Amino acid sequence: MRIIGIVLLCLATSAMAATLQEQIDSAAPNDTIHLEAGVHPGPVVISKPIKLVGESGAEIRGNGSGNVVTIKADDVTLSGLRISASGLRLSDDDAAIFITGNRARIEHNVIADSLHGIYLKKVSGAQILHNRIEGKTTLSVSTEPVEKTIGQSTENCDTTLVSNRRGNGIHQWNCDGSTIVGNEITETRDGIYFSFTNNSRVEDNLIHHVRYGLHYMYSDNNVFLNNTFAENAAGAAIMFSKGLVVRGNRFINNRGHRAYGLIFQSSDGSKLEQNEISANAVGLSFNQCNDNEITGNRVTQNYIGLRFGSNSSGNRFTENSFMRNLHPIETGGSDVSENRWAINGVGNFWDTDLEVDLDHNGINDLPHRELDSLSVLRRDFPVIAFLSESPALKLLRFANERAVIPGLSAIEDPAPLTSRFWKIQAQRSARAAVAKGK
């Protein structure tokens, strides 16, 4: 009797899987299919515009091979589902949800135990809203083997899936006009990956415990608003792109020997505004970047606040706060003189400044010179960092702020802000509003 029961259970499970695909195949365009609580075995392929809506506890579970849900049609919606157990082949781009249809709407789902979470390929108008994506961190006996590295033994294998063998939370390739809002992504390789993807909006997402929170290349005219990138190897790496708006984001607690809050590499004509860049190994890094506007950011409590690489010019810094960074600026000996540190007479706040403001306008009457005397040595000999707060270096900084010392790498802010600048600006705005009301 026990054997018969097992056989009947297997037959019932098989029928359930067939029923799900049959429901999809027999549905009319624009139909809504409601999935009851329980496991609905995948994989499934959607080739017509329909909605799949899950009741609480509804799950589409793959068989550990390939994609779990493949969306080929335009105008498909997946909502309220748990989707799990894709394959693990990076060469095949296995994913919980693989999308090649335009205007897909993926909302309020939980994605787990898969290689890539959501993979979008050559699509436009996708909406990825309020999902939780949990990367696969361990191997199990039931899944297909990961592609073997040359020379790797299969005996006594650690079941941990290291980060570079995981997939990305949301992966976009050659897409346009995506909206990615309110998602939480954790334990993947990279949180959100952009490649050749333009005109998208990424807002209010939380990405933590991944390699790069945002890994971004060759993608233009995208907007990033109010996202949090925390406790990753790097908060965001933005490379080879232009025309971006990065506003109101938090890049925090990204720690490690080579951890960054935000890396800008070969990216031009963009705006970085009102971001919090705090408690990272390196807060903000610029390399070969030109004509960017960096306004109103808080760069605080980093080991290095702002690192300049080579060939960056025409960047404009104003109303930023550099506070409690062990090394506010690192230039590595690069010439940074072609960048501007004050716009229309308004510079940046440096917490090391002696404040002299005789006319009470919130602008320091003395210029700020930020000295970077040991950065080259510090990279080759990290122990040099122990000298950062030594009396000799403090004396050197003090002397450099009073007169330029030839041969030392430094930046000069001609109009540094005092701690009262923002209060004075708020008072002026309030008076202007009252006057306008009259």
Q: What residue spans do the PLM features occupy?
A:
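Surface-exposed loop/turn motifs in large extracellular/passenger domains
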Residues: 70-80, 97-107, 120-140, 161-162, ...
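Bacterial N-terminal signal peptides
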Residues: 4-14
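Functionally critical loop-and-helix segments that line ligand-binding/catalytic clefts
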Residues: 130, 155-157, 165, 173, ...
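Acidic Gly/Asp/Thr-rich repetitive segments characteristic of extracellular carbohydrate-active
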Residues: 15-42
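Extracellular beta-strand-rich solenoid/capping regions of secreted or surface-exposed proteins
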Residues: 40-53, 60-104, 116-123, 172
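Extracellular beta-strand/beta-solenoid scaffold signature
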Residues: 62-70, 90-98, 113-116, 120, ...
